[in-house]
C-alpha cells in the first residue's frame, strides 16, 4: 500500500476469509456495509463491518479484495510449515491461501505478507489434519463389513494394492444402523493427493465394499 501511495506501478490485493468477508460487498457499494458472518479459523480478520478509516484507506489504495475458504487457509498453513518452515496463524496465511487457490493472480513478481504467528498448538494440530485431508493426503474411511473372518484382511490387502498407508484402525460391532451380522471398520489412511484418494476408494468399491469418507 505504501508503494502504491508513492505512485509506483504496484497492484495491491487484499484477502478475506470467505465466511467473514465484509470488504468485497462494501467496496462494490462504495460504503461500509454490515454482512452476515459465520465462524472462520481466520478469526483475526473476521469482521462483519469495515471500520470507516480502514475502509477509506483500502478504497484508495487496494485494487481488489478476494476471498478464500477455510480449506484454502488450512492448505496454506500446511504448505508454509512444510516448504518454508514457518508457523503462520490463519489470518496471516490468507495471502498464500489466495495464491494457492488461484485468486487475485498478478502478472509479475508477487510478494505476500505473512502477518502473524499467533496460533494455539491444538488449533495448529487440527488445521494440519484438515489441510492434509483437504489436499487429499489423509482421509478417514468407515466401511460396513459382514461379521466373518477374513474381511479385515481383505480390506488391508486392497489398500496395500492401491498404495495407501493405514495409520489407524478401529473395528467395532456397535453403531447406529448396524445389523447384528455387521461390523464397522474405521481406518485413517495416508494418500498421495486427490487422484490417489479417489483411486483408493474406487479399488474398495470395485471389490464390493461401500466406503464412506468421514469429514472433519
Where is each model-derived feature located?
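Short low-complexity, flexible loop/linker segments enriched in glycine and/or proline
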Residues: 28-29, 82-83, 182-185
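Beta-strand->loop->alpha-helix junctions that form or flank phosphate-binding loops
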Residues: 14-16, 67-69, 88-89, 167-174, ...
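A conserved regulatory-domain signal marking ACT and ACT-like small-molecule sensing domains
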Residues: 121-216
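Glycine-rich phosphate/pyrophosphate-binding loop at beta-loop-alpha junctions
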Residues: 1-60, 97-146, 156
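Active-site-adjacent helical/loop segments in soluble small-molecule enzymes
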Residues: 51-108
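Catalytic cores of large soluble enzymes that bind and process phosphate-bearing ligands
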Residues: 15, 46, 50, 65-72, ...
Amino acid at each position: 500500500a505504501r508503494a502504491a501511495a508513492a505512485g509506483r506501478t504496484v497492484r495491491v490485493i487484499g484477502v478475506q476469509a470467505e465466511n467473514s468477508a465484509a470488504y468485497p460487498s462494501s467496496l462494490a457499494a462504495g460504503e461500509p456495509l454490515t454482512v452476515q458472518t459465520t465462524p472462520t479459523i481466520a478469526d483475526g480478520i473476521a469482521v462483519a463491518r469495515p471500520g470507516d478509516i480502514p475502509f477509506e484507506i483500502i478504497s484508495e489504495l487496494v485494487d481488489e479484495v478476494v476471498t478464500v475458504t477455510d480449506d484454502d487457509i488450512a492448505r496454506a498453513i500446511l504448505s508454509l510449515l512444510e516448504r518454508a518452515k514457518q508457523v503462520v496463524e490463519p489470518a496471516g496465511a490468507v495471502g498464500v491461501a489466495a495464491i494457492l487457490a488461484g485468486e487475485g493472480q498478478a502478472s509479475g513478481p508477487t510478494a505476500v505478507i505473512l502477518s502473524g504467528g499467533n496460533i494455539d498448538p491444538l488449533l495448529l494440530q487440527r488445521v494440519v489434519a484438515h489441510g492434509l485431508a483437504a489436499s487429499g493426503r489423509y482421509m478417514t474411511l468407515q466401511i460396513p463389513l459382514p461379521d466373518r473372518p477374513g474381511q479385515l484382511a481383505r480390506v488391508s490387502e486392497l489398500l496395500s494394492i492401491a498404495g495407501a498407508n493405514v495409520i489407524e484402525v478401529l473395528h467395532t460391532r456397535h453403531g447406529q444402523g448396524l445389523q447384528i451380522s455387521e461390523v464397522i471398520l474405521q481406518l485413517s489412511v495416508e494418500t498421495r493427493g486427490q487422484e490417489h484418494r479417489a483411486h483408493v476408494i474406487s479399488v474398495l468399491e470395485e471389490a464390493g465394499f461401500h466406503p464412506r469418507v468421514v469429514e472433519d
